[in-house]
Amino acid sequence: MSGKPPAIFLMGPTAAGKTDLAIELTKVLPCELISVDSALVYRGMDIGTAKPSKEILAAHPHRLIDILDPVESYSAKQFCTDALDAMAEITARGKIPLLVGGTMLYYKALVEGLADMPPADAAVRAELEAQASALGLGELHRQLAEVDPESAARIHPNDPQRLIRALEVYRVSGESMTAHRQRQFAESRGADAGANGHLPYTVASLAIAPTDRHILHQRIALRFSQMLEQGFVDEVRSLRARSDLHAGLPSIRAVGYRQVWDYLDGHLTENEMQERGIIATRQLAKRQFTWLRGWDGVHWLDSLACDNLSRTLKYLGAVSILS
């Protein structure tokens, strides 16, 4: 192993079994867990995020869970700051940071760094949101393809948050998001370790998912149904009762939450809400797979295998993470 301390990434699509495997690893390795999930950061959003139970979190603490109120925003840049701080603390105690979750942008930002993008502009964002409502997301994707074809190729036409942000960057700065990132990458080469994406760790990257995509779809549908049985609608109803929360916030736009919110607003029937929630979760999983297919050096595990712990330990030994 190089002189860098070790770290483990445990990635994968939603409903693949990442948390269960991570907890098993903490029982046999000197690891501490860091959540890599843009929804788990929010307090009071437990059922719809499939957040580990209070009992599990007490026995197996996860950093970066329940750190924000749902009215607040959380960026990939802030995640990098928080995650690097947590990793440094864990390493200083002689333990291994084990990062687990499915927000692939956060992993990418941690490894490659983020370009310094212009700040959000409320007026521009409101104009783009109005266009999306009036003309549809397809029109926004068409506009993005004209000014930033590289970003348009990366961003799904049904991903409003990223579409709007990419167009916002262009309108505010006059430069595409791709141009910002390319300049940042050029400037970061040769930078000090830990800055601008030169992660000062030797990372073992693992991903877990069923080898049969149909099985993952079944797991997604089952989990969404279980969430509803556990009181997901009441959870969103409690959030909706707050005067400071609305459907445009990143927390409420999280998969599942926006569909239940629309149901409570009377825009969807109960069956439509459940169907759209499952579809949205499947689309999220598809995007996660897309990210993972381009991830260098990832070691895949089958969610249904009974020996994933031993396979993981064997792999970590082979790449000298445990030496």
Curated annotation (Swiss-Prot):
Transmembrane segments: none annotated. GO terms for molecular function: ATP binding; tRNA dimethylallyltransferase activity. The record marks T103, R125 as: Interaction with substrate tRNA. SUPFAM superfamilies: P-loop containing nucleoside triphosphate hydrolases. Substrate binds at T14, A15, A16, G17, K18, T19. Its cofactor is Mg(2+). Its EC number is 2.5.1.75. The keyword ATP-binding applies. It is an enzyme of class 2 (transferase). It holds the Pfam family IPPT. Residues 37-40, 161-165 are annotated as: Interaction with substrate tRNA. One of its GO terms (biological process) is tRNA modification. InterPro entries: Dimethylallyltransferase, IPT, P-loop_NTPase. It catalyses: adenosine(37) in tRNA + dimethylallyl diphosphate = N(6)-dimethylallyladenosine(37) in tRNA + diphosphate. HAMAP family: IPP_trans (MF_00185). Monomer. Belongs to the IPP transferase family. PANTHER family: TRNA DIMETHYLALLYLTRANSFERASE (PTHR11088:SF60). This is tRNA dimethylallyltransferase. It comes from Pseudomonas entomophila (strain L48).
